[in-house]
Amino acid sequence: MSQQDLTSDMLTRIRNAVRNHSANVTCLNNKLNRGVAQVLTDEGFIEGFDVVDDGRQGRIDVHLRYGERGECVINSITRESKPARRIYMKVDELPRPLGGLGIVIVSTSSGVMSDRLCREKNVGGEVVATVA
């Protein structure tokens, strides 16, 4: 089956795994998905991820993070920029989800990074997703 938007598919799989209280979720591998997983790891929303080579495209195993009472750290994860409607923002236009408690994942010319890192490096780009 052909997937058109692998990043939307990855975010939907993570959202469904959070609802089912799954420990791990498997997603298809590409450069943007690896970047999104790295940002989620760096910001503490997931435990980590493993890139598995299966002889074809490969896959990413994402390990979700849960709190002491069993609640997932990710409350919401939303795809912002879509293939039919790309959203680009300058660094001063980037929103602060939940007053700074959430993050915006941005694809820049310097790689995929969070809105906090974009403000430090003073770069804007395509808004990929919002995580809270």
Name each model feature, range by range.
Residues M1-A132:
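Core subunits and conserved enzymes of cellular information-processing
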